[in-house]
Amino acid sequence: MAPAMKIVFGLLTFVTVGMVIGSLLQLAFINRLEDSYGTGFPSLRGLRGQNTRYLRDVSRWANDKDAELLRIGNVKPEVVSWSPRIIVLHDFLSPEECEYLKAIARPRLQVSTVVDVKTGKGVKSDVRTSSGMFLTHVERSYPIIQAIEKRIAVFSQVPAENGELIQVLRYEPQQFYKPHHDYFADTFNLKRGGQRVATMLMYLTDDVEGGETYFPLAGDGDCTCGGKIMKGISVKPTKGDAVLFWSMGLDGQSDPRSIHGGCEVLSGEKWSATKWMRQKATS
């Protein structure tokens, strides 16, 4: 074998071994975190086993297991707008939950799509330049995902069964999502659960410049969006925080003021997880 080929072969072997080791470490992290959550919760025993074991090493809520799962005392709500209705939930996810969602999603990321108003199907578009994936129905039954979904249901007051599958997204530098509404303009998507009423957007990283969630019709001041000064309100990505906002007004009609976008990422990576909630059960 020629010396040049030996060098190339050696580099390929090194990279392959590194990828295998990385995957094994990632799998070990997922397994450890899953073990720490046990197999069920008091209100969800019909979905999993009968025995219940919760997060270890949480002494503050040693006598209140539901409070552990809901992170009562940790989550700090902040109302940033009443019209449209926007609430930032600080420390909504634990650091471990953020890493868990990223670990599940990373191997399955694909180019993100948007809903075609004519067909109701996902299509690629320059409106949205990220990569993402949806959790499966099987993954939805995992204890950690159950805990997150139960927390979303409690803080949003929308039943868990009305929620779509969680979507995990990654935005790299120069990627963005142009302003849009989460509610549907087509009739195809309304057949499964009706209209979208609310969104829970959860941030999984914060080592990013730019990438704010921008509401151009909220508030009457200025904000920062991808390094630019804009009219409206923006929320900076902070690991563990979540933004809860409603696409439907108190009158039961879709709220055009809920238009929002993902500002351009200037540096770093922005990871997020989104849960859309409907008027009725989605399955």
From Swiss-Prot:
Residues 1-6 are cytoplasmic. Binds 1 Fe(2+) ion per subunit. Changing residue 180 to E: Reduces activity more than 500-fold. The keyword Endoplasmic reticulum applies. 2-oxoglutarate binds at residue 270. One of its GO terms (cellular component) is Golgi apparatus. The chain crosses the membrane at residues 7-27. Plants over-expressing P4H1 show absence of trichome on leaf and petal surfaces, increased root hair and reduction in seed size. Catalyzes the post-translational formation of 4-hydroxyproline in -Xaa-Pro-Gly- sequences in proline-rich peptide sequences of plant glycoproteins and other proteins. Hydroxylates preferentially prolines in second positions in the -Pro-Pro-Gly-triplets. Hydroxyprolines are important constituent of many plant cell wall glycoproteins such as extensins, hydroxyproline-rich glycoproteins, lectins and arabinogalactan proteins. Can hydroxylate collagen-like peptides and hypoxia-inducible transcription factor peptides. PANTHER family: PROLYL 4-HYDROXYLASE 1 (PTHR10869:SF42), PROLYL 4-HYDROXYLASE ALPHA SUBUNIT (PTHR10869). This is Prolyl 4-hydroxylase 1. The lineage of its organism: Eukaryota, Viridiplantae, Streptophyta, Embryophyta, Tracheophyta. The gene is P4H1.
